[in-house]
């Protein structure tokens, strides 16, 4: 393998990346389920959320504030829109990075209608002053707006209409306890099972007017990393291949051939993932090897290897992070069809000078 091939495999460009690009955002709007009955997967979350929303409607009150955590692409934004739809309320969408000052948040909160849903994505990235203002807004439906500066500054209380905050985060551990405690309902979104992704793919194919058989859907689902967003993206690329190279019908063979062109293998690994594994196995005998050394060997930044490639490899049981460095598992050797050397025993070797 040419190690230079992986140098442009950034998180935003990866076909199997979970972050949404502009095409994803446009297509997801058309594919997004409108209510809880249409939403596929996350059975426990759906059941619990349904109870919360039904009870709120029965009381004629706004819903409790909701915190949704989990990896990108699992449906947090979709659920926020479903919450608004189920409550018959409008929704306002913003994100933590967009709220850097308390005044930014005050402007949004003061313009909310009664019962409106405020969706705050990446809530863990909100600034501390805005975060502290949110405490009072969530609990008492009021904020204190500071007018003036220095000794002459005064706090003017501003009453807010009752609203529902839906916060979404990929890093729930970064939320301070006072903020987490103010959410009446908290749910963690799990990765999807293959059979759930098959249902997602069949539904999306119907909406996109794409003909696909059950084995074709299963082939795509198996490479989708447990993430509906990735499943829908792979479906679109396989659709393109089927239209150009075949009769437009997606079968298992067509799906496999298409994803081979796009370099997504049977377990959902792409060029960057395989580059990391091949370097670890072929150059370092399976490890342990330090992260910095491994990144140099792959031709990527340390952060790219650690934050983009490694999480999925660890989740798949192909790579282990140890105090002495990165170590390939027996499953990694098997996946690449390689035979481990006699001393590749899962981390008993000597680490390198760069550390883990």
Curated annotation (Swiss-Prot):
Annotated keywords: ATP-binding, Cytoplasm, DNA damage, DNA recombination, DNA repair, DNA-binding, Hydrolase, Nucleotide-binding
Residues binding Mg(2+): 77
Segments of this protein annotated with the region Small ATPAse domain (RuvB-S): 193-263
GO cellular component: cytoplasm; Holliday junction resolvase complex
UniProt-listed Enzyme Commission number(s): 3.6.4.-
InterPro entries xref list: AAA+_ATPase, AAA_lid_4, DNA_helicase_Holl-junc_RuvB, P-loop_NTPase, RuvB-like_N, RuvB_C, WH-like_DNA-bd_sf, WH_DNA-bd_sf
Predominant localisation class: cytoplasm
Alphabetical GO biological process terms: DNA recombination; DNA repair
Compartments (UniProt record): Cytoplasm
GO molecular function: ATP binding; ATP hydrolysis activity; four-way junction DNA binding; four-way junction helicase activity
Residues reported in the UniProt entry to bind DNA: 302, 321, 326
EC primary class: hydrolase
Catalytic activity of the protein: ATP + H2O = ADP + phosphate + H(+)
Region spans: Large ATPase domain (RuvB-L): 4-192
Alphabetical list of NCBIfam families matching this protein: PRK00080.1, ruvB
Family membership noted in the UniProt record: Belongs to the RuvB family.
Cross-referenced PANTHER family: HOLLIDAY JUNCTION BRANCH MIGRATION COMPLEX SUBUNIT RUVB, PTHR42848
Complex formation: Homohexamer. Forms an RuvA(8)-RuvB(12)-Holliday junction (HJ) complex. HJ DNA is sandwiched between 2 RuvA tetramers; dsDNA enters through RuvA and exits via RuvB. An RuvB hexamer assembles on each DNA strand where it exits the tetramer. Each RuvB hexamer is contacted by two RuvA subunits (via domain III) on 2 adjacent RuvB subunits; this complex drives branch migration. In the full resolvosome a probable DNA-RuvA(4)-RuvB(12)-RuvC(2) complex forms which resolves the HJ.
Name used for this protein in its record: Holliday junction branch migration complex subunit RuvB
Biological source species: Streptomyces avermitilis (strain ATCC 31267 / DSM 46492 / JCM 5070 / NBRC 14893 / NCIMB 12804 / NRRL 8165 / MA-4680)
